[in-house]
């Protein structure tokens, strides 16, 4: 059987930085989504994924909210850059669910965010998906966001939704995906609560729980964000983990190769 390969391009925490500018000078900077996207090499066995926190955090983000009044401009940008899947970050709720809906409603990419449901419901609003690549490889994709949104966000901005504990939500989705996926991938808008080399506790809160996700669940790939911390690809408890820095300073490229029963992820 011939090898089958999945390539993933991953960004996170762009915070509205689309162009190569920091808005502080006229000099071009080595940041921004367009800089990253110009290097994506996409084919039928490639997925382009974002880990959330796109809508808020830059003068452009403020202009789109204050002057245009909806998120369609950012949807158009993501469409142009060829995104396939996104999850939600805590700052994507900063302008309320109507604004968020105007972004998602015009987005070609699928949103996956398993722990976000309607206030009086239990089914996820943005459920996990199985994406079949051109080569036949089946990729099970789950998204989750830190439930600290409930602590930080203005109540009126999230009045119509419920954001639950990410781990039970991800675990339930993973259980459904395992038998129908060749590769399982989780997009987590959250970071690491422990040092990856030593296991030393960095934070005892529930804000960042990527280390625990790797301990308790068995995704093949965990794409993280939120901390604005560059984490090079490495394996933790059998799960391949990465995190890009913020504002499009870098993107992550992950390759998974399946050769019979063997998986190689780099």
Label every model-predicted segment.
Residues 1-266:
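Acidic, metal/ion-coordinating pockets
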């Amino acid at each position: 059987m011939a090898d089958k390969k999945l390539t993933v391009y991953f960004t996170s925490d762009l915070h509205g930085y689309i162009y190569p500018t920091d808005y502080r000078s006229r000099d071009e900077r080595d940041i921004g989504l367009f800089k990253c996207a110009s290097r994506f090499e996409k084919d039928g066995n490639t997925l382009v994924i974002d880990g959330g926190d796109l809508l808020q955090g830059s003068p452009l983000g403020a202009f789109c909210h204050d002057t245009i009044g909806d998120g369609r401009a950012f949807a158009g940008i993501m469409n142009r850059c060829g995104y396939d899947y996104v999850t939600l970050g805590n700052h994507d709720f900063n302008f309320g669910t109507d604004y968020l809906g105007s972004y998602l409603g015009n987005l070609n990419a699928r949103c996956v965010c398993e722990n976000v449901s309607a206030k009086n419901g239990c089914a996820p609003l943005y459920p996990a998906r199985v994406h079949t690549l051109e080569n036949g490889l089946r990729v099970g994709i789950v998204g989750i966001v830190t439930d600290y949104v409930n602590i930080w966000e203005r109540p009126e901005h999230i009045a119509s939704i419920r954001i639950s504990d990410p781990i039970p939500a991800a675990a339930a989705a993973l259980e459904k995906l395992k038998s129908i996926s060749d590769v399982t991938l989780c997009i987590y808008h959250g970071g690491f609560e422990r040092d990856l080399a030593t296991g030393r506790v960095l934070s005892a809160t529930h804000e960042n729980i990527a280390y625990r996700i790797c301990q308790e669940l068995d995704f093949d790939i965990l794409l993280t964000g939120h901390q604005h911390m560059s984490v090079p690809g490495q394996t933790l408890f059998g799960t391949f983990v990465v995190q890009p820095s913020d504002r499009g300073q870098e993107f992550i490229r992950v390759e998974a190769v399946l050769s019979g029963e063997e998986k190689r992820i780099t």
